[in-house]
């Protein structure tokens, strides 16, 4: 996996093209829930581990955070096997706290976004490929909705049931505001069906390419 990530980043200049010495680097995985370990609801820990290694080798100071739909970032990380890896690399796990930020759109200039994400020197977005009942598919843009902390996330999901277009526009504005320097999608095993939480694992590579 580490070698695959290095090959992926090599044409872009490697991790050092995105991370400079001393940069604070948010690693933003999908930490949806602690409730279904093994069902591919979250970004796989080994991806975050390898990316964190590359960040540290580039001189960055990685930290790890999300605003899960259910529970705390630390609780979801613990349930899904993250803690030993994070402890080995001495990477702090942070809970997100909201603050109002202006966005490029007057319609959504009241968005509350994670202070931790907005204050990071670098954001590395690490989403999971999953089906999504409301949006069909969740990947890079939708993962940044995890930077909307607390009760506002539930409110926006209810709004999606009323107006999917407006919800999608809000997601775009959130992504533009967070503006991640790098997105690496976990497609080792996706999730299909009743996603993003109730689906089943799905291998994305066909047999002839395995």
Regions found by a protein language model. Give the residues of each.
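N-terminal and secondary-structure boundary signal
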Residues: 1-208
């Amino acid at each position: 996996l580490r070698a695959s990530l290095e090959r992926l980043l090599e044409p872009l200049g490697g991790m050092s093209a995105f991370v400079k010495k001393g940069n604070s680097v948010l690693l933003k995985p999908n930490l949806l829930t602690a409730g279904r370990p093994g069902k591919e609801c979250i970004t796989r820990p080994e991806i975050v581990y390898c990316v964190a290694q590359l960040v540290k080798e580039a001189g960055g100071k990685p930290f790890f955070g999300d605003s899960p739909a259910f529970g705390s970032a630390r609780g979801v990380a613990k349930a899904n096997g993250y803690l030993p890896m994070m402890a080995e690399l001495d990477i702090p796990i942070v809970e997100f706290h909201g603050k109002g930020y202006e966005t490029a759109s007057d319609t959504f200039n009241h968005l509350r976004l994670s202070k931790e994400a907005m204050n990071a020197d670098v954001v590395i977005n690490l989403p999971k490929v999953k089906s999504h009942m409301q949006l069909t598919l969740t990947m890079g843009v939708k993962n940044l909705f995890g930077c909307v902390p607390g009760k506002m996330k539930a409110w926006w999901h209810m709004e999606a049931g009323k107006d999917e277009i407006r919800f999608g526009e809000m997601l775009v504005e959130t992504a533009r505001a967070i503006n991640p320097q790098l997105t690496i999608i976990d497609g080792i095993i996706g999730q299909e069906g009743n996603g993003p939480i109730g689906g089943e694992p799905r291998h994305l590579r066909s047999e002839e390419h395995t």
